[in-house]
Amino acid sequence: MSDKPAYLTRDGRARLEAELEELVTKGRKEIAERINAAKELGDISESGEYEDAKNQQAHLEGRIREIKSILARAQIIDEENGDNHEVRIGSRVTVRIDGEDGEETWTIVGSTEAKPSEGKISNESPIGSALLGKRPRQKVTVETPSGTMKLTIVDIQ
């Protein structure tokens, strides 16, 4: 697992803690019951149900380890104490994209919480990393997988 910080909002940390609690309590219990039920059917060496339950158990334990690692490295983004003079993790940034009408607003978050469809972009993404440290009215050129984008920062919250 990585040693680099995992940037999270308070809500993001709470969601991960709730997911971890659910996996450790309910998830482990359900899979243990499935494994025991498959064992009761007899020969487990050729049991598809047993093999499926063991695979799900491995997946569940992997997710538990992943969440624990993220929480251990968590650095909480203080969204209320925002500096609107430059883009940082936690900033809500409004940009104008050259060649397009209107504006886009994105929140810069850690990679764990990134959901572009919800306007949350990772600080590690091409756009997110290019915006970090920039100020209002500054122009930014970003190389993305789909080509070069030219942005103008309109507002930072």
UniProtKB/Swiss-Prot annotation:
One Pfam family this sequence matches: GreA_GreB_N
Disordered as annotated region, ranges: 113-142
GO biological process: DNA-templated transcription elongation; regulation of DNA-templated transcription elongation
Entry GO MF terms: DNA binding; RNA polymerase binding
Keywords: Coiled coil, DNA-binding, Transcription, Transcription regulation
Protein's UniProt keywords contain RNA-binding: no
Gene3D superfamilies noted in UniProt: Transcription elongation factor, GreA/GreB, C-terminal domain, Transcription elongation factor, GreA/GreB, N-terminal domain
Recorded coiled-coil stretches: 13-75
Function of the protein: Necessary for efficient RNA polymerase transcription elongation past template-encoded arresting sites. The arresting sites in DNA have the property of trapping a certain fraction of elongating RNA polymerases that pass through, resulting in locked ternary complexes. Cleavage of the nascent transcript by cleavage factors such as GreA or GreB allows the resumption of elongation from the new 3'terminus. GreA releases sequences of 2 to 3 nucleotides.
Family recorded in the similarity comment: Belongs to the GreA/GreB family.
Protein name from the UniProt record: Transcription elongation factor GreA
